[in-house]
């Protein structure tokens, strides 16, 4: 399965300028996804992060991986248009600056699904070199109570 930006907008709730993925080239619902974010010179965050040395903020790199990963769930039956919240992020690493003109390839896989908790591994690549990676958990809001601990 493939999705262009218009199709992505139909199945998930993020919108420009916060929609941080452009298209998915390969989706296996409930399993994995590959897709891209094209970093244009006029992206809103390049103006402020950092003047003279523009690069994609790390948390927006994470958000791109989350948005791409969510397509694995949103392409499942009866999941179109739902919302997923980030509840955990681990093993977060940044290896390379992502700059204007880069083509960020995002590869994600669903590693486990326990009720409404979805655990993912994801990596962003620039020219076949890993730029960022993380494991994280997304949850359907209201589906279960997350106890913050004591």
Q: Language-model segments: which ranges?
A:
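Active-site helix/loop of acyl-thioester processing domains in fatty-acid/polyketide metabolism
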Residues: 24, 56-80
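Hydrophobic/aromatic beta-strand elements that line small-molecule binding cavities or substrate pockets
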Residues: 22-23, 90-92, 121-122
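Catalytic strand-loop segment that frames the active site of acyl-thioester-processing enzymes
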Residues: 15-56
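HotDog/MaoC-like acyl-thioester-processing domains
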Residues: 30, 98-105, 109-150
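Beta-strand-rich interaction surfaces with strong enrichment in secreted/lumenal proteins
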Residues: 9, 52, 94-96
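A structural signal for short, hydrophobic beta-strand segments that form beta-sheets
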Residues: 21-25, 86-87, 110
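Flexible, low-complexity linker/boundary loops enriched in proline and small hydrophobic residues
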Residues: 1-25, 137-138, 147
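Hydrophobic beta-strand-centered segment that forms part of the acyl-chain substrate-binding groove
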Residues: 1-2, 69-107, 131-141
């Amino acid at each position: 399965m493939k999705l262009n930006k218009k199709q992505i907008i139909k199945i998930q709730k993020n919108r420009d300028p916060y929609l941080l993925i452009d298209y998915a080239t390969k989706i296996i619902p409930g399993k994995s996804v590959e897709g891209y974010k094209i970093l244009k010179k006029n992206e809103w965050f390049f103006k402020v992060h950092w003047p003279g040395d523009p690069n994609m903020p790390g948390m927006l790199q994470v958000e791109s991986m989350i948005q791409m990963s969510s397509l694995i769930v949103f392409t499942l039956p009866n999941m179109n248009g739902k919302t997923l919240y980030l509840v955990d992020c681990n093993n977060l690493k940044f290896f390379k600056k992502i700059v204007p003109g880069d083509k960020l390839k995002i590869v994600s896989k669903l590693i486990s699904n326990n009720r409404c908790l979805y655990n993912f591994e994801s990596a962003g690549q620039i020219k076949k070199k890993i730029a960022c990676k993380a494991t994280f958990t997304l949850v359907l809001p209201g589906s279960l109570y997350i106890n913050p601990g004591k």
